[in-house]
Amino acid sequence: MSKKETLWDIAVIGGGASGMMAAITAARTGKTVVLIEHKDQLGKKILATGNGKCNFTNSEMIPEAFRGDQNLFHSIYKQFDRDNTLSFFHEIGVLPKCRKGYYYPASEQALSIQKALEMELTNLGVTIMTGCVPDRIQKADSLKGYLITGAKLDIPAKKVIIATGLLASPNSGSDGSFIPVIKNLGHHFTPVVPALCGFETSGYNPKSAAGVRFEGTVSLFIDHVLVASDRGEIQFTEYGISGIPVFQISRYASVALYEKKQVEAVIDLFPSLSTEELALELKNRFYRPSRYRRNYMQIFNGLLNQKLTACLCEYCGFIPEQKPKEEQYPDAIRVLKDAIKGFRITLTKPRSFEYAQIACGGVRSDEINPGSLESRLWPGIYFSGELLDVDGICGGYNLQWAWSSGYAAGLHASRQIEEEKS
């Protein structure tokens, strides 16, 4: 498909959340916009968010929910914040529904978000090109803009917005295939690693409790220093550990592993009891009349999941079916208490990008104007979304960044065209 006869005001490369927002914002200013997506459908990654329900923003926009370049985040977020996001989606037909601070479409279908964006693009006259793979951007001085080329692709545009994502969830389109094109422009990247993901472990592997989910607290230690912690539903797996609390601290762990540092997760298997309360509970369970003498599995019945109990015994060097003798009780209580409150696992590797919800890292912020997201190397080229060195924890924060950065890139690219006319 050739669009060489048309000089577009703005070409957006990448039809995900941020790219669609950038295209809509630019088109609303009256600019001619073409949106280029190498997959056969726009917004494929949106469809998988929030377990198919699409948690698209959050009521609590706390600074600590965002990692990476905090200054860049604040500069962009104030231009299009949570309230702007809620108003925007309501305007295009998505009634927001809040549950425990998490905003979803009232339909509780991610498809509602994707379709609403797609319909708005169509209503605004944005040209959508799917199945197109651009592989080069070059300056076209005669056009006072850029030429985007690829197989059967030849698109001239005054401004270019790149919203291709990084490497997370490659099947949805974020496969990293455009990163070499960006590097060929002279841009550099901070380390790109998986985030919002589980981790493989070494040493003791809790795979004997694979599939077990439990309320716990995970504390992350990097080179023996506590860096972050989070509480919620943790899951032991065949490969190591997973669950939302693990996802929330994953950025720090992934970056530290990339830097070859020692990374450990210390898990409190029973955070609802203090150390003293747990010691008393264990003492009461061990010290029963002799006729109640039981093995470890029986002692923990009703306290911990059975598979988790077997895993705990294995970790402590006890045989689950063995009945401890009374003289062994004090040591057993101490060892088990310490293990429950401090189950230590060495993390060796994040799960691959295929299993990561996002990637952290991105184009270096010192190569980008923090107010407009315009390249400092190539005026007229803008970046948005996951490509930038900002990422969030679970809870709608990464989609909020997509909306905010897409809006900013689309707005400033449009304004620049207006300024060049005057």
Label each region the model flagged.
Residues 4-18:
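Beta1/beta-strand and adjacent pyrophosphate-binding region of the FAD-binding site
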Residues 6-8, 150-159, 229-231:
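Core beta-strand elements of the Rossmann-like FAD/NAD(P) dinucleotide-binding domain
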Residues 40-42, 47-48, 56-60, 95, ...:
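An anion/pyrophosphate-binding glycine-rich loop and adjacent beta-alpha core
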Residues 51-100:
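Glycine-rich active-site loop/strand segments that organize a redox cofactor
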Residues 130, 309-391:
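A glycine-rich dinucleotide-binding beta-alpha-beta segment and adjacent secondary-structure elements
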Residues 130-144:
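A conserved short coil-to-beta-strand element within the FAD-binding core of flavoproteins
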